[in-house]
Amino acid sequence: MAENEKVTYGGALPPSPSTADTEVAALARSMTNASRSSVYSPEKPDGTNPFLGTDDPRMDPLSGKFEPERWTKAILQLQSSDPEGYPHHTAAVSFSDLSVYGYGRPTDHQKTVGNYFLDIPGLARDILGRKGQRIDILRNFEGVIRESEMLVVLGRPGSGCTTLLKTIAGETHGFWITDNSHINYQGISFKRMHKQFRGEVIYNAENDVHFPNMTVGQTLRFAAEARTPRTRLPGVSRSQWAEHMKDVVMSIFGLTHTVNTKVGNDFVRGVSGGERKRVSIAEVALSGSPLQCWDNSTRGLDSATALEFVKSLRLSSKYAGATAVVAIYQASQAIYDLFDKVVVLYEGQQIYFGRADRAKQFFIDMGFECPPRQTTADFLTSLTNPGECLPRPGFEGRVPRTADEFAAAWRNSRDRQELLQEIERFNDEFPEDGEHLEKFKKARKLIQAKGSQSPYTLSTPMQIRLCLKRAWQRFMADTSNFLTSVIGNFILALIISSIFYNLPQNTLSFYSRGALLFFAILMNAFASSLEILQIYEQRPIVEKHKRMALYHPYADAIASVLCDLPGKVIASFAFNLVLYFMTNLRRTPGAFFTFYLFSLMCILVMSMIFRTIGATSKTISQAMAPSSVILLALVIFTGFTIPTRDMLGWSRWINYINPIGYAFESIMVNEFDGREYACGDFIPTGPGYTDVPATSRVCASAGAVFGSDVVEGAAYIATAYEYFPQHKWRNLGILFGFIAFFACTYLFATEFIAASKSKGEVLVFRRGHVPLKKEGASEDEEAGTGSTGTRTQEEPVDKDANIAGIQRQVATFHWEDVIYDIKIKGQPRRILDHVDGWVRPGTLTALMGASGAGKTTLLDTLANRVTMGVVEGKMQVDGHDRDSSFQRNTGYVQQQDLHLQTSTVREAMLFSARLRQPHTVPDAEKAAYVEEVIHLLEMQKYADAIVGVPGEGLNVEQRKRLTIGVELVAKPQLLLFLDEPTSGLDSQTAWSICTLLRKLANNGQAILCTIHQPSAMLFQSFDRLLLLQRGGQTVYFGDIGENSRTIIDYFEGQGADPCPHSANPAEWMLSVIGAAPGAVAKRDYYEAWRGSEAYRAVKEELRQMRENPKPISQESTDALRVYAAPFHVQLFHVTFRFYQQLYRTPSYIYSKIFLVAGSNLLIGFSFFNAHNTIQGLQNQMYSVFMGLTVFGNLVNQIMPHFVTQRSLYEVRERPSRAYSWVVFMLSNVLGELPWNTLAGVVLFFCWYYPVGMYRNAEVTHAVTERGGLMFLLIWQFMLFTSTFAHMLIAGVDSDVTGGNIASLLFSLTFLFCGVLAGPSGPNAFPRFWIFMYRLSPFTYLVEAMVSVGVANAPAFCSDIEVRHFEPPSGETCGQYLQQYMSVNDGSLANPNATADCQFCQQTTTNSFLTGIHSSYAHRWRNFGFLWVFILFNIGMAVFFYWLARVPKGSRVKKQK
């Protein structure tokens, strides 16, 4: 490789020029002079190039003995031989007077169907640039982080941590930096850094977005290749560099074993959540950016892995000069001690910036006390919670309390003066646009490929090649979509071809040939419609990689198009080959390949259009409704349903810009031009007309000439469609033009239009319930309530709230010898092994253990929530077995905070109280109890706030409190289970949740709570502990004791090493039993427990409870019911809640209304006031037919809502026995009813009157009856659509799968409804398919709507529909046709003429109805049939849900 003479450490770990330089120089000298005999000494690498292979296992990342520090020193030694050839670049940063602000409201009102349009003035203000109220997010920040330094950012959620990191990284979407703010990246200005050198300063969010079907190795290899430098170590190719760097980061982050495992996501099985987090970290590490901002990147990692992550940053800083800024919400002392500097944030203000080892003493000197065993990070963060910080004795009234007071104290401190001096020295050393900028540019230039433009490392062709390779890997990893597409297209082609099988070579096939080619071109055109969804799936990943400067988004777009091309060719060939030859289209090679060429061109044009729609819209819901109307317009104005001649003047332009129209014209010309078709039907014909001269009859087809037995194909398409042979190849050029235009718009949109970003969090209230004066904290993006322009301080936690009214529990729940076995891959596996314990009222019991020890499984088993496996053992309440009401009488707070997004806090709790408290309790009493719980949980300020989604609604802590509240208001009579209530929370929020649990326990609640590695202070909140080791084996059950003394004494008595005074007893205890990563137990503590005195005391206590049961109170049968509320009460509340949810989701309702209104207004005005000519009546039929096409979009709107409802029900509400599954299914159907009725009304007025069918009713004096029946039929169509959607999705996991099934079934019902082909006549499909014609609900709907719309009205012919012929000599036209007209409908314009007879084939619309197998007499029969279909859908929806998703009895085998 020519560009391979030299190499820098490049994107990976460039050497540092400051303190590390001296170290490296000395290191290099000592290594160079070292003797060969010492090559394996840990301090002295041997000078070999690890990229080219090495015998030293400590330098080989795949050896299992890899030492990153030794490897790093070896690279630096090699590079030190040519400092000019391997220049490095660093990006330290200083900032002063840094203030950040946004615009918005601290609270917002909830949008509903009723108030949606009241926000139009606000929208107008936004458009005019009036941004609303200014909100200060960060105020007057100052700091400096030099190269090789690490800064930890501490603060509660909402304090501004995320905003500070984003500001440093230049990701300022949604907020603004004040003009007087100054940021200096070591001599590079803020603007220049983020324009020219994007990717050198990067921000890593806590979300993990990757392509789920790619393996970990492929994902990281891609990142390594994208940042491979041009100058590398001698002899190292690009491929070797990328492969070795991938291996190195995988070894550092413990991912080597996952190299061939898919990354996965919530829907695709792959690596674990913690491993996925490490993949994200490794990907950023490979970018080698000199300044890295990490936002809560340790969330989801255990403490050992989090420590390894921070150690890897330390290594990068020490030897590469990298600068790291890290926000961590729960930092152990070991993690904190790795940082050089710390900044503490309090409500958007800086209250400390300086050395990490001085911060604690700074605040102690200020007058605060750090409790024993509290980590420094927790101590610093606790200062920002007035209810938690502790003044030292004598300092109670002198320490700062509010954010403003803390900020003032910091500004007046000596530490701050020293910081200002340091910033000044830094800025003097690195003036903007000075010497360091030139060094930085030079280093970047050496790294970049030749021809690459900053800020990307690779040139554009190299980026495209790399993205193409990745696209192929993604395709090979998941070929299911491709194979489904090919097989599905093949089967659909067989079905369509069988309907039009072997068309005759006469004029009777004209309509069928046109319909077949129309359907074929539409199937080709819409084959790429799912590409919109694909764009949204990969968009977050592409945008992330753009921020990391890995590649241009348009490079990925080009690669995606190229990779999809072979698949499109194969899938379309499978479809078109079968369809073309089975149906007897023109059988010549040239004709087939011309047909295929235009079909393929249509696919490519529409692919570009779909991609453009996806790339230009910011959200998927934004894309759906408008694109549906646009696509419908393309279908209507193709030229088949409305020939170009009949298109109304206002809409003719749509055909001119319609690529499908040009493709359709060319394949019609290809089929008909240059061919003659024998006439299949003459006028007149029949008895008495067999021997008439040729000039006295004419073929009943457009383009016919009297006197001829054949019709020229070119004449037919010219007359019927105004299509001309000379346009065929012209249209190909036009299609190429469309492809080029939409390819450009697609590439432009991918490069410049970003997906919508979330706002900073604000509370959302119902309109009329917004607090008049909202006081809150910061509007930082990671959490928190919204803020106003002025900040007021948060109230301290009320630790003594009145809780007297809360339900007290009196029963003790106890379990003995609980065993749980399941089969994994056919092999039995024990998850729980003889677990004993109890929970008494008024106690808080912690359930702890190693990851995989069975904590959640034990909770599920005790709560009677496991659905498979074998459970053994005794689980009793006061000595009695659990009854059918057990699940209803226990509260279970799950780890996931699942709530209905549109409910308010109060409504969510009322719903739980009404359905889970006994039915005999008056509603007023339930409401009063809810208010008590709201007060207890300190939720008064946001009781009327909408739950919402993260970003717009409750924050993490508020959601957790609501989850607990929903269970409390159910008045659980037995106990409360909690699964990881502090998981993912910052330390202060975790503390407030544990304080709340303590408060509940003090009030008599019995609580069993799993908790993962709590801090020493959190651990002390609990009374008792049940500790499990791997395999579900108990190693301790008993009291914790004051300062954990009891449990420490127990384990020390069993031979454990003494617990250090400063250690966290919870972490010490886990390491003792070998549950902490890397720890090994000295003995089997399960056996030690079984042989201990404490174990015998537990067994004795359990025996006493078992043998002395408390007397059972004489409960009513109501108390033992599975559900507290009767069926009708459940149905009322659940249906009302679902109706309310839809009312509060205006985007769903209005997109439904817009879809229905837009589509049908388009149809109505496209077929405006259709006349009762032959073509006009066809147009009226097509207006019904086209109206059915909204079916698919309506179904796809309903399904995702159902899946959301179902996940909430199945995960939280069904296990707690709130209401039955039948109620759930019926409420979903009934809740849609009002909105479907409204949509039906809109559809009726937007379609019925513009098309002009009411005029046919006027003639028959049945305006009211026919108009009313038409509305009822439309209403039935809406109900059928809704119930059909519920039937399909009821038993299916994914709305995507349900949508695919719906599309297939819709295509079949659409094909067999009798419009494109019928059961008899010239357009008849084979008799085999007659059953589909009778099964299709659209058969009856179309027949009823068309007959009600056009029956019993007079009809006539347009000029081109009149057939001309000569009567026999001596006869008038009337005499000649008298016999023919006696048995056939028709009229003569000139019955007395003796030449040029002008005959129209219809006088009444009923003859048209007869031709399409419709009858007005069947209208009420069809109306009844449609109700049968609707009721069948409802019944099958309930049945499928029961069959697929309702546990049948219980699959759990219970053994005593």
Curated annotation (Swiss-Prot):
GO terms for cellular component: membrane. ATP binds at residues 849-856. GO terms for molecular function: ABC-type transporter activity; ATP binding; ATP hydrolysis activity. Residues 118-372, 813-1056 form the ABC transporter domain. The keyword ATP-binding applies. PANTHER family: ATP-BINDING CASSETTE TRANSPORTER. This is ABC-type transporter eriD. Gene3D superfamilies: P-loop containing nucleotide triphosphate hydrolases (3.40.50.300). The chain crosses the membrane at residues 481-501, 515-535, 561-581, 590-610, 623-643, 734-754, 1148-1168, 1184-1204, 1233-1253, 1269-1289, 1301-1321, 1337-1357, 1423-1443. It is a multi-pass membrane protein. The keyword ATP-binding applies. ABC-type transporter; part of the gene cluster that mediates the biosynthesis of erinacines, cyathane-xylosides that show unique biological activities, including leishmanicidal activity, stimulating activity for nerve growth-factor synthesis, and agonistic activity toward the kappa opioid receptor. Keywords: ATP-binding, Membrane, Nucleotide-binding, Transmembrane, Transmembrane helix, Transport. It is found in: Membrane. It comes from the Eukaryota.
